[in-house]
Amino acid sequence: MSDLAQGFHQAQQDVHSLAERPDNHTLLRLYALYKQGCEGDVSGPKPGFFDFIGTAKHEAWGKLAGRTQDEAQQQYVDLVAKLRG
């Protein structure tokens, strides 16, 4: 396992033990970076109009289209480290 993969895995664990819950904007950013880092560009249909949370997640992930999985993983690691202080 590469250093980046190990760091990404550790950040996934660390995010669950943050001292404070991040704001919704940061949570969406974490979600989008995680999905981009694991799966690449957004796929599948956009959630229905009344699925506000699903739509917000889909749009946040879609904004990262074209970013490599390695870039997204590194940004996820960096964001979690920043949140941990």
Which residues does each PLM region occupy?
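A charge-rich, low-complexity, intrinsically flexible signal that marks solvent-exposed coils, linkers
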Residues: 1-85
